[in-house]
């Protein structure tokens, strides 16, 4: 149910194409025969820094299929120290236990999907994504798929917070993580060392949020 793609930006184009089919259509094709993937199904991918040996930029179409993109960075010194201590005592993987099974995850997905988002929230989402399409520092803005993903992620944030309805702060919290990796900067913006996350922050600041009723 979970496919982990390590060093995705070192994969061959044929591998990229196969993964795209799995993510978009929920199936894989082997020797001309199509096989449906189990549900739920999700992909978690890791990338090496662009410019490292053998890396390449992922196609825009594939980046658009990933719902969110997170940058891990380096661990805090305290976390790194704890990592060393755990590795010395035993293999941390030996102590991993499941926290949910397939049916539990499916039930959570249904609950998240049932989380209410008002028409005002939908209009807010569309205003945000539309703003990326006319931004002077972007040559490619967020696609309609980004709007759908932002609505889904906003529902998930609301559910985690214990609510059965979405409020504007849910959208704001997840906006950059959901949208930034789908944006393409202009050459001038790249030369000025601007980045997509900062542009998302600026768009949030300039776009009026609906009032919570």
Where would I find each of the regions flagged by the language model?
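Generic alpha-helical structural context detector
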Residues: 20-21, 68, 82-85, 126-130, ...
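C-terminal engagement/docking regions of AAA+ P-loop ATPases
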Residues: 132-213
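Electropositive phosphate-/nucleotide-binding environments in soluble metabolic enzymes
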Residues: 13, 74, 119, 148, ...
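Conserved AAA+ ATPase small/helical "lid" subdomain
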Residues: 95-150
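Alpha-helix N-cap and coil->helix boundary residues
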Residues: 58, 79, 116, 120, ...
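Canonical AAA+ ATPase core
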Residues: 7-18, 23-100, 105-115, 155-160
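Hydrophobic positions in the central parallel beta-sheet of the AAA+
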Residues: 3-4
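Alpha-helical structural signal
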Residues: 16, 40, 63-64, 80, ...
